[in-house]
Regions:
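Short, Gly/Pro- and small/polar-rich lid/capping loops
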Residues: 1-9, 17-18, 22, 101-103
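Generic N-terminal amphipathic, Lys/Arg-enriched alpha-helix
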Residues: 1-12, 179-186
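Short, N-terminal intrinsically disordered low-complexity segments that are rich in Pro/Gly
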Residues: 8-17, 190, 194
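Active-site nucleophile and cofactor-binding loops and adjacent substrate-binding regions
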Residues: 12-17, 60-64, 88
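Alpha-helical support elements that line or immediately flank enzyme active sites
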Residues: 17-35
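Flexible, glycine/charged-enriched surface loops at secondary-structure junctions
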Residues: 34-41, 82-87, 108-110, 194-198
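A structural-propensity feature for long, helix-poor, extended segments
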Residues: 41-82, 95-107
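Signature of multi-pass transmembrane helix bundles
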Residues: 103-207
Length: 207
């Protein structure tokens, strides 16, 4: 149950573009607080796994696809409070503004040379100001937010599983103890679907 709750999130489309949009939304919010107005450029640095899974993913409700569009949409109009559903709440005019940035070549995607399999960094610039954000290890685990180079949030050296949320399970923990046999044994011998807290599965079915 802890793994399901940790690994499953409601998202607009695939989780990887959602994580990119969330990171960009955090960076965009930081930019606006620093004094930037209309987004001029967006740079995304991500791990190979994120790029592989997000590069050609479509964005529901639009004709757009790819992490460049996800980043632009998040940066221009995203509110990070919506987490991986952030693109659901961006108005049409801001969607079009984001698309114009991509078409003008103002959104760059680069490979981040990092050990993490899940890593997204977004830098947004406007009016001489910058906003920067980093998501790492888990799709909604924001570990860094900066306004003009000054950190307003810095959890880069914090273990997400030790940050106070008992439901968080890191990929390393999953790899350490999860096997096909342990999943089978849990489902056939321990899981009680009528009483165990499996709300995330019910939400997934409803979606």
């Amino acid at each position: 149950i802890r793994i399901l709750n940790s690994e499953m999130e409601l998202a607009t489309g695939c989780t990887e573009p959602g994580a990119v949009a969330l990171t960009a939304a955090e960076a965009g919010a930081a930019l606006r607080k620093a004094g930037g107005t209309r987004v001029e450029a967006v740079t995304v640095r991500a791990s190979i796994n994120i790029i592989k899974n997000a590069m050609s993913a479509g964005i529901p409700g639009t004709s757009y696809q790819g992490m460049d569009y996800a980043a632009a949409i998040g940066a221009v109009g995203g509110d990070p409070v919506h987490l991986l559903e952030v693109m659901n709440y961006v108005p049409r005019e801001q969607m079009e503004e984001a698309a114009a940035l991509v078409k003008a070549g103002k959104v760059k995607v680069e490979v981040a040379q990092v050990p993490q399999k899940l890593y997204v960094e977004v830098v947004v610039t406007a009016d001489g100001h910058t906003g920067r954000a980093v998501v790492r290890d888990l799709h909604t685990n924001v570990v860094l937010v900066e306004q003009d180079g000054v950190a307003t949030l810095d959890k880069q050296h914090t273990d997400p599983a030790a940050a106070g949320d008992s439901d968080v399970v890191t990929p390393e923990q999953i790899a350490e103890f999860l096997t096909v046999r342990s999943i089978w044994d849990y489902c056939t011998e321990e899981l009680d679907p009528l009483h165990d807290p499996i709300d995330i599965i019910r939400s997934a079915v409803q979606v």
